[in-house]
Amino acid sequence: MDVVRTAIGLMSGTSMDGIDVALIRTDGRGFIERGPFLGMPYDAEFRGRLKRALELARPLRDRNERPGELREIEQELTLRHATAVTAFLERFGLAANGVDVLGFHGQTVLHRPDEGLTIQIGDGRELARRTGLSVVYDMRANDMVHGGQGAPLVPAYHAALAGKFQQAGEAVCFVNIGGISNLTYIGADGRIAAFDSGPGNTLIDQWVEMQTGRTYDPGGEIGGRGKVVPALAQRYLDSPFFRGNVRRSLDRGDFAPLRPDEASLEDGARTLAHVAAASIVKSAGFLPERPSAYIVCGGGRLNGTLMAEFSAMAEGSRVLSAEAAGFDGDAMEAEAWAYLAVRSLDGLPLTFPGTTGVAAPVSGGVLATP
């Protein structure tokens, strides 16, 4: 009988807006019992520090290198994650000795799959020491060692959630709209295909922050007042990324932000929401078949302008928020990291040829004990 474990997942994504903490009970296979979720936003000063980490990581060629200031930021990030775990346990009245493992993503500061290089800052051993819990971390590296792109990793969890659609004979596609958007297709026969689809919230967030100092477009309200600037949209959609049959994973720096004088605030936000939606649809053309439904998770599902654009382009497929499909769109990535941590403990694959391009299914992750 497969062992059911209690796991907490910790996710800090490319939007760099905070730490998501979620608990599940799972056997790392088909049994999943979802528990509580807590989002802990970063303050503006630390968000600035994480952006600085992106600059510091740019010249690195060794994934284990942490020069000076980057090491300091890593230590602070790790401490914040330890604090988040403590706050989560206290908030929901949970005992640490009832948790079997933490799944720790860390913060991606560099991802260059063509060079076989990915760097996530966050000290798993220090997190284990501070929390007194076992930690599985560094889950992307082994995939890249075996020729994969190192992303996306969440599809293994999406596949486990897709059972009710498979039972109905439906193909479904999970769309995670974070800083970068990615797709996970699960066919009625269980076939999985997954890849990054293009820019998600990153370009919108960068534009709104540049123009207003706010960190995102709440509800898509700003974009909703604007109009699409076709020439600007086409500049993004003509990217070589959308051509050719080989899908690759993306870094948030792969698409340059708009220049400040290229559009009004509203038109820029609307154009970039259009680009995010059109990127999903263009990339979905590489899926084995058109899904009957798109299940949208991640922060982008809360941008009404983006969702309206996507729904209008979806060519007959249903577009549902994660909540409408019975899931929690805020918690899903953190839940996935908890699920992957349990799979790692059991030596089960985290990635597959159809998700990262790895030659054969491989496990991954490093275990740190207190």
UniProtKB/Swiss-Prot annotation:
Gene3D superfamilies named in the record: 3.30.420.40
UniProt entry keywords in alphabetical sequence: ATP-binding, Carbohydrate metabolism, Kinase, Nucleotide-binding, Transferase
Transmembrane segments: none
Pathway as given in its UniProt record: Amino-sugar metabolism; 1,6-anhydro-N-acetylmuramate degradation; Cell wall biogenesis; peptidoglycan recycling
UniProt-listed Enzyme Commission number(s): 2.7.1.170
Residues bound to ATP: G13, T14, S15, M16, D17, G18, I19, D20
Catalysed reaction, written as an equation: 1,6-anhydro-N-acetyl-beta-muramate + ATP + H2O = N-acetyl-D-muramate 6-phosphate + ADP + H(+)
A single BP term in Gene Ontology: 1,6-anhydro-N-acetyl-beta-muramic acid catabolic process
Domain of life: Bacteria
Pfam families named among the record's database cross-references: AnmK
Entry's Gene Ontology molecular function annotations: ATP binding; kinase activity; phosphotransferase activity, alcohol group as acceptor
NCBIfam families linked to this entry: PRK09585.1-5 (NF007141)
Record function comment: Catalyzes the specific phosphorylation of 1,6-anhydro-N-acetylmuramic acid (anhMurNAc) with the simultaneous cleavage of the 1,6-anhydro ring, generating MurNAc-6-P. Is required for the utilization of anhMurNAc either imported from the medium or derived from its own cell wall murein, and thus plays a role in cell wall recycling.
Similarity comment: Belongs to the anhydro-N-acetylmuramic acid kinase family.
HAMAP family in the record: AnhMurNAc_kinase (MF_01270)
The name this protein goes by in its record: Anhydro-N-acetylmuramic acid kinase
Organism: Rhizobium etli (strain ATCC 51251 / DSM 11541 / JCM 21823 / NBRC 15573 / CFN 42)
Taxonomic path: Bacteria, Pseudomonadati, Pseudomonadota, Alphaproteobacteria, Hyphomicrobiales
